[in-house]
Amino acid sequence: MWDLREVHACFDGEGWVWNESFHHKDVFVDENEDPKEIFWQECQMFFLQDYLSKCEIVDDGDILELQLRDSGEPVLAMMIAE
């Protein structure tokens, strides 16, 4: 089970730090599915394609982040639920 979260982040001068995050929904990822692909499908339901064209997915292992390409600001994340 993965946790899809909306992220509010602050720039600390060197990088982005999560200020708050809000649970959006639980996401089931089957063992035969790629979590990154499932995350992208969730992003497509959450944002318009025009907005997504300005974003990229960053894979940090247990956390996938949708980040704005120009600034690196995280806007949505999916992490393994504990």
Task: Go through the PLM ranges and name each one.
Residues I38-C43:
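Short amphipathic, charge-patterned alpha-helical segments
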Residues M45, Q49-E82:
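Short, mixed-charge low-complexity intrinsically disordered segments
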Residues W2-D30:
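N-terminal acidic leader/helix
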Residues E31-P35:
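A short, structured loop/turn motif at beta-sheet edges
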